[in-house]
């Protein structure tokens, strides 16, 4: 229902317009207060790059963060990552991730980024506190924030927006009548707009999510996902249909697709109940970090990597590395 409202297919969005105007007024006032200096943002002693969204829902932001961290690491840059830690609840904040940190404490995306990149990762509702925790423990040269475009309490040097190339901005309205956290005109002020799928427009960076080999959660064995049979697909991400479409494009045709809420807590019994005799469970990598501790032999995940095309990605990376002292 929400997807139909936000896309404009359902006329119910009109009933939510008063709340959307209120949301837009408040969010605009917050940004203006920092722009005019009425509120002061904290500036880190190292450059800060924000990777965020203008809309609610999954746009492919976390793969972009991983891509950016890995590209900077390849250039010899020491990178730290901070996040709000949605879906997790730590005993105390800021929380600096270790190999023992669970998704229940830090959230699924920070754990995924930590496991994929090996970069220092810290989570806290107040992003500045997370940055300070990393700087106190690690000699990093730059900070990447996973989300936080609207978190103006943390000053930033580079802003990158990730856009769903198929859904783009829906009906264009603020939450809750539409998907917008800020108006599309905000794109004029960011340093880069990366478009996941669909057709990128002038000045935007095209991106595709490229699937790899399916990985068994228990053994680490790898195979082409199309070789798996009797698949039940599970996706607890911002936009589950994208994952299901990826499986179809890979030649894997799920018998059943199970969409879950983004950051949803996964209980062992609930996940086990999805899979019948002779079936194979295939999930996203973000779900896998939550399920690995209780995985069954027939559970697999399909990793995806961001693939950015054209000359703009290199120019963006050059711009970012030029800020590193």
Swiss-Prot record:
GO biological process: lipid A biosynthetic process; lipopolysaccharide core region biosynthetic process
Pfam annotation, one family: LpxK
Keyword Transferase attached: yes
Recorded catalytic activity of this chain's protein: a lipid A disaccharide + ATP = a lipid IVA + ADP + H(+)
Binding locations of ATP: 55-62
Claim: Manganese is one of the keywords in the record: no
GO cellular component: plasma membrane
A molecular-function term among this protein's GO annotations: ATP binding
Listed pathway(s): Glycolipid biosynthesis; lipid IV(A) biosynthesis; lipid IV(A) from (3R)-3-hydroxytetradecanoyl-[acyl-carrier-protein] and UDP-N-acetyl-alpha-D-glucosamine: step 6/6
Domain of life: Bacteria
Alphabetical UniProt keywords: ATP-binding, Kinase, Lipid A biosynthesis, Lipid biosynthesis, Lipid metabolism, Nucleotide-binding, Transferase
EC number(s) reported in the record: 2.7.1.130
Record-stated family: Belongs to the LpxK family.
NCBIfam families recorded: lpxK
Task performed by this protein: Transfers the gamma-phosphate of ATP to the 4'-position of a tetraacyldisaccharide 1-phosphate intermediate (termed DS-1-P) to form tetraacyldisaccharide 1,4'-bis-phosphate (lipid IVA).
Name listed for the protein in its UniProt record: Tetraacyldisaccharide 4'-kinase
Species in which this protein is naturally found: Salmonella dublin (strain CT_02021853)
């Amino acid at each position: 229902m929400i997807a139909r409202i936000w896309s404009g297919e359902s006329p119910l969005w009109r009933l939510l317009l008063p709340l959307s105007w209120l949301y837009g007024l408040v969010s605009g006032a917050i940004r203006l207060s920092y722009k005019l200096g009425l509120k002061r943002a904290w500036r880190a002693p190292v450059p800060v790059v924000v990777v965020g969204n203008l809309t609610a829902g999954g746009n492919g932001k976390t793969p972009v963060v991983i891509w950016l961290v890995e590209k900077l690491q390849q250039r010899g840059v020491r990178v730290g990552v901070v996040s709000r830690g949605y879906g997790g609840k730590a005993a105390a904040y800021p929380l600096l991730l270790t190999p023992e940190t669970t998704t229940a404490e830090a959230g699924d995306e920070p754990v995924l980024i930590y496991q994929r990149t090996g970069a220092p990762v810290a989570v806290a509702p107040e992003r500045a506190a997370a940055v300070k925790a990393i700087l106190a423990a690690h000699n990093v040269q730059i900070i990447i924030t996973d989300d936080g475009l609207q978190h103006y309490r943390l000053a930033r040097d580079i802003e990158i927006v990730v856009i769903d190339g198929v859904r783009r901005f829906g009906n264009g309205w603020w939450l809750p009548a539409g998907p917008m956290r800020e108006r599309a005109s905000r794109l004029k002020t960011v340093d880069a707009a990366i478009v996941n799928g669909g057709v990128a427009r002038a000045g935007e960076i095209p991106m595709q999510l490229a699937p790899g080999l399916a990985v068994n959660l228990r053994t680490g064995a790898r195979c082409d996902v199309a070789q798996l049979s009797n698949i039940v697909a599970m996706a607890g991400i911002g936009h589950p249909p994208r994952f299901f479409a990826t499986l179809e494009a890979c030649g894997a045709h799920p018998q059943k697709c199970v969409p879950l809420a983004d950051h949803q807590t996964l209980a062992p019994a609930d996940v086990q109940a999805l899979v019948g005799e002779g079936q194979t469970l295939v999930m996203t990598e973000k779900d896998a970090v939550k399920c690995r501790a209780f995985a069954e032999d027939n559970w697999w995940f399909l990793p995806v990597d961001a693939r950015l095309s054209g000359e703009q990605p290199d120019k963006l990376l050059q711009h970012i590395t030029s800020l590193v002292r």
